[in-house]
Structures are given as C-alpha cells and as structure tokens.
C-alpha cells in the first residue's frame, strides 16, 4: 500500500506538536461539470513545532498518533515571513 501525500497550508499552529493543514481539492461536479473546490483540514504531527501559520507544507499519511492525528509533516515547502507589525 502506497502512502498518501498532500500539499496544503498551515491554518492553525496553536497546539503542541500538532498543526492543522488545509488541503484544497478541485474536481468537476458529477452532474454539472463545474469545477468545485473542497477544503479538507488534516491534523498533522509536527515534532519540532517548526511550522507557522501560512506555511506551505507537504504531509504524508502515517500510523494513528492520537484520536485525530494520522498525518505527519514531511517537509516545509514555503515559510512565511512574520513582521513585527503583524503582532499588533
């Protein structure tokens, strides 16, 4: 069985060693053929707490780590730059 991989954006980093990654899946509607976007949120394991909100990451499927965590951060593709003005 091949491991699944997804690319998404970190939308929450408030938990310890866990981030929430939003993955956008685009597909044609079965009847109307219009392109529809569906956002799925995955809780992913981040052991070093290295991800921040807005980072673009690649996640991979893993064994169940908790009740809701079945994904782990494989690599950070794009880091976001935080300014001092954003904290105000």
Swiss-Prot record:
GO cellular component: cytosolic small ribosomal subunit
Molecular function via GO: rRNA binding; structural constituent of ribosome
Entry's Gene Ontology BP terms: translation
InterPro entries: NA-bd_OB-fold, Ribosomal_uS17, Ribosomal_uS17_bact/chlr, Ribosomal_uS17_CS
Keyword Ribonucleoprotein found: yes
Keyword terms, alphabetized: Ribonucleoprotein, Ribosomal protein, RNA-binding, rRNA-binding
Pfam families: Ribosomal_S17 (PF00366)
NCBIfam families: PRK05610.1, uS17_bact
Function: One of the primary rRNA binding proteins, it binds specifically to the 5'-end of 16S ribosomal RNA.
Alphabetical list of PANTHER family matching this protein: 40S RIBOSOMAL PROTEIN S11 FAMILY MEMBER (PTHR10744), SMALL RIBOSOMAL SUBUNIT PROTEIN US17M (PTHR10744:SF1)
Subunit structure and binding partners: Part of the 30S ribosomal subunit.
Homology family: Belongs to the universal ribosomal protein uS17 family.
Protein name per Swiss-Prot or TrEMBL: Small ribosomal subunit protein uS17
Species in which this protein is naturally found: Prochlorococcus marinus (strain MIT 9515)
Lineage start: Bacteria, Bacillati, Cyanobacteriota, Cyanophyceae, Synechococcales
